[in-house]
Amino acid sequence: LLAFALVSEPVFNLAHYEQWTGPALQNVLFTLSLSCLELFVLARIESDAAERGKRIALYVLTCLVFGAAAFAVRSEYVFLGTLSAALFYLLRSAGVWRLAGLLPLLIASPWVLLCAPLLLLYSGERGRRGGKYFFYFFYPAHFLLLQLLGKWIATALA
């Protein structure tokens, strides 16, 4: 996942900043990489820490550490992305309350609400494996296509 984040970064920067290196945010695959690692740590805490108080303290500490890491690498959504991932994980069996994972992302974009119905439909079971890597290749490809389309339109209008 981190390899896809690194490969996608120059094209992401080109699309957002019109240069190969971007001074501001990194692409969302960095957020996803950090979030996956965070969920691994949260799962270990869940299975290893029997005492509820200790588990909660470790959950909070994990969220703070990964939030700081997201801030340090300037991942997209910064600490809000990793916090949302943690909330989705920790509230995964809480029914409609799992939508609380959207709250941090609402600060960044109200469009996040559009995914709420999809989240409510999720059964908790892993989907088909086919096409998994398609989206990792599509992510940088769509930035490149949009950049080329923008250049073509700008040239046509000039």
Provide a role label for each language-model segment.
Residues L1-A158:
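Alpha-helical transmembrane segments and their immediate juxtamembrane cytosolic regions
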